[in-house]
Regions:
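FAD-dinucleotide binding site
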Residues: 1-510
Length: 510
């Protein structure tokens, strides 16, 4: 990897493919294209690889550094492409701790300890939750995760919010909150009245079913020893100096303007407003950073859609892309890391798994580390310190960031203590992942459409724009919003470019 210093001029590079973004999607696109015999340059704005996966450290009151995963971390059994890549890279994994009883806090603030997956709610609420989940899965079965906009009722399903639909289906607020948590705060990290039923069904379909999202032992199954960013670090190590860090792409020149669109009388230059050949064919691409000028025949835009506008496209994107990108936005979530002398909850026979629909902290899990990591963990050994990870989502995250630091910490730990008791209030280390403040992320976990946006504009998200191909978890079918989706999309982009090259050359891909 190369970290470029600031220079007065630009260094020129020439590659078959320029990849913008060195997260899992971009690195997989580059790795795939290179394996097919193409030359690549990966330009990354940050001074690290990994995108929304990020291994980090937090200093504790004991003066020691403790390992945390600032970004995405879990692997579920259906994420087969990520699983195979992790195995190929030789990265060990371990299962999330889940032995013991779980904790549920109901809308009245009463704490319940329970076994299994079903919340300890009133029988009526339990039946209502089962009925709603069955109804969602019935609709999910009709959805093609690769093209939800093709459903015969896509526009209808896309104009009603997930919350409104739940309230039409049920008059049980607790059931509604508990079902909503798995899509709203748990995945899209937006209030359930701000995204559509169709968007919720896409989330379900991408995981195989809504019941898979409900099953925390499925969706949050395993972790990578040393952190999920290790996947990107390993791929970047393979690519070597083809990866250049600290180089945000300022301008992407990608097409010749259509002279017929110029309007000299009104001072409008020629552009490509009416579209280009959306076939992903080679073109003349120039990516400009502060220090580099990369000439290529293809570009892979491997950043989340909310960051597309950070690049000045010359000429500007066609009108339909420009409009579509304005209907996609990031969610907002705070990932809470609290490190303790020991995993004290285990002493009390608790798993560390906690839920409370509609509460400040709606989910907590035992996130105790294992294996080698930045803090000096031993191979295959569990950290003696216990770590809890909790999540503060959407409007609650907004409220927390508005507070002074100590008030925010006290409020969050107080909310966690509702589940696990007063010892929760005394971590030796405390850290909040703030992806919304990251210039090259601007939110978490991923982007989703506003009401009506998916059915109108979703068909554009994976379609190449001239020589520009797209790759990120935000536009995935399988693995939507997950690292697995990023890997799949990166691989698909790399293969699509290689296949196009082979077709144009009259040769098979290998």
């Amino acid at each position: 990897m190369t970290t470029a210093p600031a220079t007065a001029g630009r260094e020129r590079r020439t590659s078959d493919v320029v990849v913008i973004g060195a997260g899992p999607a971009g690195l997989m696109a580059a790795r795939t294209a290179k394996a097919q015999g193409l030359s690549v340059t990966v330009l990354e704005a940050r001074r690290r690889v990994g995108g929304r996966t990020w291994n980090g450290l937090v200093e504790g009151a004991d003066g020691k550094d403790h390992f945390i995963e600032i970004g995405g971390q879990w692997i579920s059994p259906d994420q087969t492409r990520l699983i195979s890549l992790v195995e190929e890279l030789g990265l060990p994994t371990f299962s999330r701790f889940r032995d013991g009883r779980n904790v549920y806090v109901d809308p009245r603030g009463e704490r319940h300890v329970y076994d299994g997956l079903d919340f300890p709610v009133a029988e009526k609420t339990d039946r209502e939750m089962d009925r709603l989940i069955a109804k969602i899965d019935e609709l999910t079965a009709e959805i093609d995760a690769a093209a939800p906009w093709e459903h015969p009722r896509a526009a209808e399903l896309d104009k009603i919010s997930f919350r409104h639909w739940l309230e039409q289906e049920s008059d049980d607020p607790e059931a509604i909150d508990n079902v909503s948590i798995y899509i709203a705060s748990g995945m899209l990290t937006k209030p359930s009245h701000t995204f559509s039923l169709l968007q919720a069904l896409l989330m379900s379909a991408s995981a195989g079913s809504f019941r898979n999202l409900v099953d925390e032992d499925f969706i949050l199954d395993k972790r990578v020893e040393g952190g999920m960013q290790s996947v990107s670090l390993a791929m970047a190590a393979e690519l070597g100096d083809d990866v250049v860090l600290g180089q945000p792409v300022r301008t992407l020149r990608w097409a010749e303007p259509d002279p017929s669109t110029a309007d000299e009388k009104n001072g409008v230059a020629a552009d490509v407003r009416n579209g280009v050949a959306h076939d992903g064919a080679a073109g003349d691409v120039v990516a400009l950073t502060d220090d580099y000028e990369v000439h290529a025949r293809y570009a892979v835009l491997a950043v989340p859609p909310n960051l597309y506008s950070r690049i000045s496209f010359e000429p500007p994107m066609p009108r339909e892309q420009q409009i579509a990108h304005q209907h996609i936005s990031m969610g907002l979530v705070i990932k809470v890391h609290a490190v303790y002398e020991t995993p004290f909850w285990r002493e009390e026979g608790l798993s560390g798994t906690c839920f409370g629909g509609g509460r400040l902290v709606q989910e907590i899990y035992d996130n105790t580390n294992r294996g080698e990591n930045l803090a000096g963990g031993a191979p295959g050994k569990e950290d003696p310190h216990g770590t809890l990870v909790g999540f503060v989502s959407d409007v609650y995250a907004e409220q927390m960031w508005a507070l002074p630091e100590e008030e925010r910490k006290a409020a969050i730990l107080g909310a966690m203590a509702e589940y696990l008791g007063p010892r929760t209030l005394e971590p030796i280390a405390f850290f909040l992942s703030d992806m919304a403040a990251e210039e090259w992320t601007r939110g978490a976990y991923a982007t989703s459409y506003d009401l009506g946006g998916l059915s109108r504009w979703g068909h554009l998200q994976n379609r190449p724009t001239g020589p520009i191909h797209y790759a990120c978890s935000d536009i995935a079918a399988e693995g939507y919003q997950h690292v697995d989706g990023a890997i799949r999309m990166g691989e698909a982009a790399g293969l699509a470019i290689a296949e196009r090259e082979a077709t144009d050359a009259g040769q098979p891909t290998g």
